[in-house]
Amino acid sequence: MKDLENLQKLLGYEFENTKLLNEALTHKSTKLPYSNERLEFLGDAVMDLIVGEYLFKKFSKTNEGDMSKLRAALVNEKSFANMARHLQIGEFIHLSTAEANNGGREKASLLSDAFEAVMGAVYLEAGLDKVREIAVRLLEICYPKIDFSHLVKDYKTALQEITQASLGTTPIYELVRSFGPDHKKEFEIALLLNDKEISRAIANSKKEAQQMAAKIALEKMKK
């Protein structure tokens, strides 16, 4: 595992209390007395606020519904995992041997959780302004074009237009199951056309899972 100094250089912030950073990088699989789950919970809330504020200022004439869609496109597992990869967080996470051997350092869920935890740790030690500075810089590096056309992909609407025109029917989305802790629930959605299952997807919200299932269905139709 690399020296934490390298991560702090990439982050653009040097911790006074490196124990806090270590906690943010400790996965529950280590079975240590502490893990990054509490910091992840905090970091999730902080990032939600920062991204919301950023979009509010950047898109002064955009309505609430569209801003919510933009925020959802940026505040999610995939987005946070992308930012974690930019920081090379996977190389610094403390994992059990089994989890590491199972590709844990590349898992989007683990990377996203660790990123949120690191943001939570920065917030605790340095406050909101420092987290905002780091988060906005990472957002603009990882997403150089932050606008509706580049970020918000409404696969459900696209699929519905195609199926109505070609099949005379609309897709049905069914919840297969929900699982995980209350603050990190995941939802599995099945997409059906004429009572036949076409695709399935799992995400952190029903809406995101539906969009992912619609995207998979669209990709199948192109083949």
Curated annotation (Swiss-Prot):
GO terms for biological process: mRNA processing; regulation of gene expression; rRNA processing; tRNA processing. InterPro entries: dsRBD_dom (IPR014720), RNase_III (IPR011907), RNase_III_dom (IPR000999), RNase_III_sf (IPR036389). SMART domains: DSRM, RIBOc. PROSITE patterns: DS_RBD, RNASE_3_1, RNASE_3_2. Mg(2+) binds at E40, D113, E116. The keyword Cytoplasm applies. It catalyses: Endonucleolytic cleavage to 5'-phosphomonoester. Residues 4-127 form the RNase III domain. It comes from the Bacteria. Digests double-stranded RNA. Involved in the processing of primary rRNA transcript to yield the immediate precursors to the large and small rRNAs (23S and 16S). Processes some mRNAs, and tRNAs when they are encoded in the rRNA operon. Processes pre-crRNA and tracrRNA of type II CRISPR loci if present in the organism. This is Ribonuclease 3. It comes from Campylobacter curvus (strain 525.92).
